[in-house]
UniProtKB/Swiss-Prot annotation:
One of its GO terms (biological process) is DNA repair. CDD domains: BRCT_DNA_ligase_like, LIGANc. It is an enzyme of class 6 (ligase). GO terms for cellular component: cytosol. The lineage of its organism: Bacteria, Pseudomonadati, Pseudomonadota, Gammaproteobacteria, Enterobacterales. Zn(2+) binds at residues 409, 412, 427, 433. It comes from Sodalis glossinidius (strain morsitans). Its cofactor is Mg(2+); Mn(2+). It catalyses: NAD(+) + (deoxyribonucleotide)n-3'-hydroxyl + 5'-phospho-(deoxyribonucleotide)m = (deoxyribonucleotide)n+m + AMP + beta-nicotinamide D-nucleotide. The active site is at 115 (n6-amp-lysine intermediate). Keywords: DNA damage, DNA repair, DNA replication, Ligase, Magnesium, Manganese, Metal-binding, NAD, Zinc. This is DNA ligase. One of its GO terms (molecular function) is DNA binding. DNA ligase that catalyzes the formation of phosphodiester linkages between 5'-phosphoryl and 3'-hydroxyl groups in double-stranded DNA using NAD as a coenzyme and as the energy source for the reaction. It is essential for DNA replication and repair of damaged DNA. InterPro entries: BRCT_dom (IPR001357), BRCT_dom_sf (IPR036420), DisA/LigA_HHH (IPR041663), DNA_ligase (IPR001679), DNA_ligase_AS (IPR018239), DNA_ligase_CS (IPR033136), DNAligase_adenylation (IPR013839), DNAligase_N (IPR013840).
Length: 678
């Protein structure tokens, strides 16, 4: 070996060592100037001898040319998601399921890790050298982000030398951004007039998907390993915890907050400690991941619903923040319900900026004791929907004022009423009210109703505000000249919308009923009504006694249906829609679904949860309903079956607690295929 080649190898080895100490261990050994001197010498030598330049050299981190797109990467070992639990009983139920399946009475040993709030990635090392990096994608196929990942300082381009390196090793983990790095990034973006990110997770994801790797190189990204995928021509320990220690020895970053726990009590103790310390970690986490430590036991437990039976994510309760109520405004919905909405001083809650929260009704405002100007506790229910959970009365200023509910509709000034037995106020004007008209039309054109593609909320708003549309039938009277006068509506878009309107004229009885917007009549109820009566005339003639005999329809829903068809205006709207000029039609009569004796879905109440890869949730729902199932949106003791797709959450946990049978997507698709062939 030449002397210059030996010197280059020594420089690379020294620089890798210093990078590991600086970026992974946070324990720099030399001043930056010394590191820079070695790096400059390495680059000079590599420039002199380009034949000695290798992809894993420390000099090659900061990316080169921009890409035009990301290539696709098929994961040899699928990157599965985890089932979630949100409360202690959910974890204890998981622990019991594990022990029951393994037929063990003794305590299980688990490896507990932080659930990082970043982006899952796969790192493929060949003979210790990083050769490919990919996003998780849909679990089966991800995007090739090798050029960008090579710029992340905490990810080794070459594993530290050891005799036992596998030929192929796929390390999996999370790329994320620290809170301090996120704040610095946004401060710089503000100064430069660039995009400001909402939260560290979005910043990390956006940084990894830059087509120009030099941009990624300037982003403060870091990485923690949490597992392994593909492994060829090599061996690893049979304990997950010991595997993480092995990866750490090879120079791969592993969180120092990984603990091996024996028994559920030890796991719960670790969870509580992490929950208390979460705000001091310096980066976002949203729970603890709990894995059976033994690889042999993991293999025995296997997988279900595209998630392992041997692991669970125990997520933290929704994060809460304090903010102030600036005002309370009132919104009018499709059925005239007047809903109070709190306007808040913007506050970051669980990674999202929150400035509004619904207060539901007067009873909720009274229960909270809320006044305008109050300091309130805000959380995002399920880390999604903002809600006010309490008022900090000790912080109440002198100038607060009560929430005054309107006596007239805030949109059309019509009288409002509160029906006995209901908590909400309602505008009495019906579709005369512009707000109700807008919301009714938005419902009518929605995907699960008449499915008029391209007829978005902003188009409906313009049509109503310009008094171009008053009833659903008016939508079908629109022409290209009218549409092109709307904002942001060109000739091509107008033509596409007219074609969508034409297509929507052919529908189904159930969709049409749902589109009418009858109170309390959702998709499943509309299907049941269509199946029970077959024709619109028969349904219109049905009395309350007849209606209450239909599956899942009680007295309240029956009363709403009866009242809807007793309104002259509603009958006029229906007649207009069905007239030859408009031409809404569907196959008649609609017969009740006939369930084959061997159809496993007939007569069952089924809940769908998680995302499906073979078809959409809506398509799955249509198939199940066609086979005589009732598809519900929530799990209860009356649920017969839960079908769990990828990333199934609290519904899966509740079903398991209630001992409700769970079916994965593959089994559902198999049975749907058999039922359709029958």
């Amino acid at each position: 070996m030449e002397q210059i080649e030996q010197h280059i190898l020594r420089l690379r080895k020294q620089l890798r060592h210093w990078e590991y100490l600086y970026y992974v261990e946070a324990a720099p050994e030399v001043p930056d100037s010394e590191y820079d001197r070695f790096m400059a010498e390495l680059r000079t030598l590599e420039a002199e001898r380009p034949d000695l330049l290798t992809a894993d050299s420390p000099s090659q981190r900061v990316g080169g040319q921009a890409q035009s797109s990301f290539g696709q990467v098929r994961h040899e070992v699928p990157m599965l998601s985890l089932d979630n639990v949100f409360e202690e009983p959910g974890f204890l139920a998981f622990d019991k399921r594990v022990r029951d399946r393994l037929k063990r009475d003794d305590d299980m040993t688990y490896c507990c890790e932080l659930k990082l709030d970043g982006l899952a990635v796969s790192l493929l090392y060949e003979n210790g050298e990083l050769v490919r990096a990919a996003t998780r994608g849909d679990g089966a196929t991800g995007e090739d982000i090798t050029a960008n990942v090579r710029t992340i300082r905490t990810i080794p381009l070459r594993l530290q030398d050891h005799d036992n390196l596998p030929r192929l090793l796929e390390i999996r983990g999370e790329v994320f951004m620290s809170e301090a790095g996120f704040l610095r990034l946004n401060e710089t973006a503000k100064r430069e007039g660039s995009k400001v990110f909402a939260n560290p997770r979005n910043a990390a994801a956006g940084s990894l998907r830059q087509l120009d790797p030099s941009i990624t190189a300037r982003r403060p990204l870091t990485f923690y390993c949490y597992g392994v995928g593909l492994l060829e021509d090599g061996e690893l320990p049979e304990s997950h915890w010991e595997r993480l220690q092995q990866f750490k020895a090879w120079g791969v970053p592993v969180s120092d907050r990984v603990r091996r726990c024996t028994g559920s009590a030890a796991v719960l103790d670790f969870y509580r400690q992490v929950h208390e310390a979460r705000l001091s970690l310096g980066f976002d986490i949203d729970g603890v991941v709990i894995k059976v430590d033994s690889l042999a036991l993991q293999q025995r437990l296997g997988f279900v619903a595209r998630a392992p039976r041997w692991a669970i994510a125990y997520k933290f309760p929704a994060q809460e923040q304090l903010t102030r109520v600036r005002d309370v405004e009132f919104q009018v919905g499709r059925t005239g319900a007047i809903t109070p909405v709190a306007r808040l001083e913007p506050v970051l809650v669980s990674g999202a900026m929150v400035s509004n929260a619904t207060l539901h009704n007067a009873d909720e405002v009274e229960r909270l004791g809320l006044m305008i100007g109050d300091t309130v506790i805000v959380r995002r229910a399920g880390d999604v929907i903002p809600q006010i959970v309490g008022v900090v009365t000790s912080e109440r200023p002198a100038e607060v004022r009560p929430v005054a509910f309107p006596t007239q509709c805030p949109v059309c000034s019509s009288d409002v009423e509160r029906v006995e037995g209901e908590a909400v106020l309602r505008c009495t004007a019906g579709l005369v009210c512009a707000a109700q008209r807008k919301e009714a039309l938005k419902h009518f054109v929605s995907r699960r109703a008449m499915d008029i593609d391209g007829m978005g909320d902003k188009i409906i708003d313009q049509l109503v505000e310009r008094e171009l549309v008053k009833t659903p039938a008016d939508l079908f009277r629109l022409n290209k000249e009218i549409l092109t006068r709307l904002d942001r509506m060109g000739s091509k878009s107008a033509q596409n919308l007219l074609e969508a309107l034409e297509k929507a004229r052919q529908t189904t009885f159930a969709r049409f009923l749902y589109a009418l917007g009858i109170r309390e009549v959702g998709e499943a109820t509309a299907v049941n009504l269509a199946a029970a009566y077959g024709t619109l005339d028969a349904l219109i003639a049905a009395d309350i006694d007849s209606l209450t005999g239909v599956q899942d329809i009680g007295n309240i829903v029956a009363t709403h249906v009866r009242h809807f068809f007793e309104e002259t205006h509603n009958i006029e709207v229906i007649q207009d829609l069905l007239s030859p000029a408009i031409g809404i039609r569907w196959p008649e009569p609609v017969a009740a679904p006939v369930a084959a004796s061997d159809n496993p879905f007939a007569g069952k109440t089924i809940v769908l949860t998680g995302s499906l890869s073979s078809l959409s949730r809506d398509e799955a729902k249509d198939h199940l309903v066609a086979l005589g199932a009732r598809v519900s949106g929530s799990v209860s003791a009356k649920t017969d079956l839960l079908i769990a797709g990828e990333a199934a959450g609290s519904k899966l946990s509740k079903a398991q607690q209630l001992n409700i049978p769970v079916m994965d997507e593959a089994e559902m698709m198999r049975l749907l295929g058999e039922s359709s062939d029958a």
